[in-house]
Amino acid sequence: MTLLVTGATGHVGGEIVRQAMKRDMPVIAVARDAVGEAEAQAFPSVKWLQCDLADTDAVMALTARNPIDACIHAAAISNEAYARPDPRGAIATNVGATANLLEAARLASWRRFVLISTGSVFSLNSDTTRPILEDQAPGVANVYSTTKLCAELLTSMYRTEYGLSASTVRISWVFGPPIISDQPMRGPIPSYLLRALQSIAIREGGAEFAASFTYVADAAGGLLAAATAPELRHPIYHLGHGVNFTAGQAAAAVRSAVPGAVIELTGGTEPWTRYTSLRGPLAGDRLRADTGYNPTHTLEAGVRAYADWMRAHPELWRAGETPG
């Protein structure tokens, strides 16, 4: 089965390519910009292509030249921090590109199309204790979540109107390699871990923040399971642990992974709710029922794996001190 992965140099897309390559799956990896030598060398069996997926003619030409069986559509303007300043660009990327790929899938009768979406389509669900099941009605409140919901609706339309095996898998607050960031849109785990490894004491607010954090390897594993399952019986799936983890739990996991880390939190949710509102955890049994997949990393195991990767790549984050 030849798998098309869009957004293949991104956070989740890159991990999907990595895992698919380890399974010896034929992979066509698409990115908006030219792929560097490092990516090409890291994935020697992958066919790398450059394409602006919002360009209908370019997408049709690419898919006509390359036989494709399934697609995991990871390319996106990935959060509100990037979407709000450029709504037209967010619409073109998150909605237009999805429409182009779905039409290509219809014309070529692809076996499977998986759209990666987000828990942000539940922006209006502020009860952090109540799990959000797949059949709950979305409620969007910003540019990013609106464009992703539009993409979901298009995916469902091609499923119901044209018989395409197309489904949406929603993910939430993904963390892990290769992200190195202390920016609020990435959430507390990358920020805490980076500063802890740099021996920077963390004393700040945010203790009341909670989210359904998912380690990147688990997100990619679940998406591959959806792409390769014999049948997807539902239009919507949720991928995650089904619970929210507090910022305090994230801090404890970082302290365990980085002995000696100082993280002391006071009340509030900022800065983590600057671009994303609090919401309940994504939950549901559909993905496990249809694919057999469950996330394999606990919060602590995911943070430890992330810390190990960062220690192995100090050149990416070092600020004059060696991590412990």
Report each predicted region and the residues it spans.
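C-terminal substrate-binding subdomain of Rossmann-fold SDR/epimerase-dehydratase oxidoreductases
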Residues: 200, 204-324
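NAD(P)-dependent short-chain dehydrogenase/reductase
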Residues: 129, 156-211, 216-218, 224, ...
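NAD(P)H-binding glycine-rich loop region in Rossmannoid oxidoreductase-like domains
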Residues: 53-93
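Active-site helix of classical SDR
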Residues: 143, 147-150
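Conserved Rossmann-fold NAD(P)-dependent oxidoreductase catalytic core, especially the SDR/UDP-sugar
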Residues: 73, 99-143
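A hydrophobic alpha-helix adjacent to the NAD(P)-binding/active-site core of NAD(P)-dependent oxidoreductases
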Residues: 48, 90-91, 105, 113
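N-terminal Rossmann NAD(P)H-binding glycine-rich loop of SDR-like oxidoreductase domains
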Residues: 3-23
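Rossmann-fold cofactor-recognition segment
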Residues: 43-55
